[in-house]
């Protein structure tokens, strides 16, 4: 399916481009996913597709139409690649739940649902985590970071410009850092050591600080408020 793209800001920049979309089934057994893209967002939906892997992509380009697949499989790892100069590829992938995800994208939002361990970076774009079952380490230079239903053994979230909002479902240590934006965390009841730093903003901390607590909440922003509370349980 092919369509002319509209004028405006796209992942390729400010230009009129052409866009096409396609779908591909991945027959190989996939044990992990690695992001290796330039411009374009990535959405991974774990637990979809009945255990199979399906790759949907939307490619916006200027000049000659890019040919061939932009994803590949290396030793069981699904690698989501880019499409070259003046081109952006946006992925939506359905895959089994619990697969680890790593890698980076230069420019684009990253949305991960029901995956395993996460270690990803985007140069510019929001990062959204939902139902992550492993340790999560995420970084963006310009974008908001949100995470809900996180059940791993630790969270590290860093952004230079954006808010951070995290709600884990299991007690774990959290390190959240932003240069410009508010930080909000809501954690299950557990013993926490609480460290907060802000140069310009209010603090609303209702999580009890226990110096010998097993878990550590380390929250830092240069410009923004910090809120740390406990999730209400019935």
Which residues make up each language-model segment?
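Right-handed parallel beta-helix
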Residues: 21-26, 65-135, 145-148, 208-234
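Solvent-exposed coil/turn segments that connect beta secondary-structure elements
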Residues: 60, 96-98, 125, 132, ...
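Short acidic/polar N-terminal linker immediately downstream of export determinants
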Residues: 1-65, 83-92, 202-212, 233-234
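A broad structural signal for short, well-ordered beta-strand segments within beta-sheet-rich domains
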Residues: 30, 115, 132-133, 152, ...
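Short, surface-exposed interaction patches in beta-rich subdomains
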Residues: 147-234
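Active-site alpha-helical segments that house and flank conserved acidic catalytic motifs
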Residues: 33-36, 103, 120, 138, ...
């Amino acid at each position: 399916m092919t369509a002319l793209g509209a004028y405006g800001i796209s992942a390729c920049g400010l230009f009129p481009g052409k866009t096409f979309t396609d779908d591909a089934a991945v027959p190989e057994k996939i044990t992990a996913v690695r992001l290796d893209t330039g411009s374009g967002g990535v959405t991974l939906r774990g637990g979809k597709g009945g255990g199979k892997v399906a790759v949907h992509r939307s490619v916006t380009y200027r000049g000659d139409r890019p040919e061939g697949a932009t994803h590949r499989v290396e030793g069981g790892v699904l690698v989501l690649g880019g499409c070259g100069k003046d081109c952006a590829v946006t992925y939506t992938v359905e895959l089994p739940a619990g697969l680890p995800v790593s890698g980076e994208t230069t420019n684009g939002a990253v949305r991960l649902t029901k995956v395993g361990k996460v270690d990803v970076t985007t140069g510019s774009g929001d990062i959204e985590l939902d139902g992550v079952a492993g340790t999560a380490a995420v970084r963006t230079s310009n974008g908001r970071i949100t995470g809900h239903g996180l059940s791993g053994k630790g969270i590290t979230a860093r952004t230079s410009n954006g808010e951070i909002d995290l709600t884990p479902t299991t007690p774990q240590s959290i390190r959240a850092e932003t240069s410009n934006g508010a930080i909000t965390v809501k954690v299950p009841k557990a013993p926490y050591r609480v460290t907060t730093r802000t140069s310009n903003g209010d603090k609303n901390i209702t999580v009890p600080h226990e110096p010998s607590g097993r878990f550590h909440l380390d929250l830092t922003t240069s410009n923004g408020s910090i809120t740390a509370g406990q999730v209400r349980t019935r």
